[in-house]
Amino acid sequence: GVLLYQDQQTRYRTEVERKLSAVADLKVDELSRWKKERMADSNVFYRNGAFSKLASRFFQRPQDESMEKDLRSWLGRVQESYQYDRIVLFDASGEAHMIVADTKEPLSSATLQKAREVMAAGKSAFDDFRRNEHTGEIHLRIFVPILDGPSGGQPLGAVMLRIDPNTYLYPYIQRWPTPS
């Protein structure tokens, strides 16, 4: 009786470990794909000659209401389509010129610093989880340099795409793919 019980216990434990390992692999693969998709979203801005020209003209003439409306509309569509909770457009000095958001909190010093770093590096960066110093909320951020011309060149500014992990990421992590 004891040997039979121990054998069943070992088999059950092995089966549970196998299922947990499969779930972990599935979650890691899905999270990796999600991150790649977010970085692909940033390609809408990165080395996009049309966007670079529009941003450059806006930085040169920020009082042009028509240009501001076009740019704000364009960024708003990106925000809505890809479910970012905030998009910020920075000029080459790191000053925020346009914020498309559902929130009004000020930009954190870490955000301003990261925008400058991305412009200096000339390549996009996926920033880790950050707690907002003003609201205490946690966000992920993607920073994208706006380069002068499609093949690179001088940085004209940067775009920050802010992700609220409560929208997709946290619910996904908590979801269990098999009956428990």
Placement of each model-derived feature along the sequence:
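Juxtamembrane extracytoplasmic/periplasmic/luminal helical "stalk" adjacent to the first N-terminal
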Residues: 1-63, 76, 80-85, 138-140
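Short N-terminal helix-loop-first-beta-strand/juxtamembrane motif that initiates sensory/input modules
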Residues: 37-45, 76-96, 123-124, 174-180
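Amphipathic coiled-coil signal-relay and dimerization helices
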Residues: 45, 53-55, 94-102
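Solvent-exposed, extracytoplasmic
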Residues: 66-83, 102-114, 131, 147-180
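PAS/PAS-like sensory domains
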Residues: 120-128
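A short beta-strand signature within small-molecule sensing/ligand-binding domains used
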Residues: 135-146
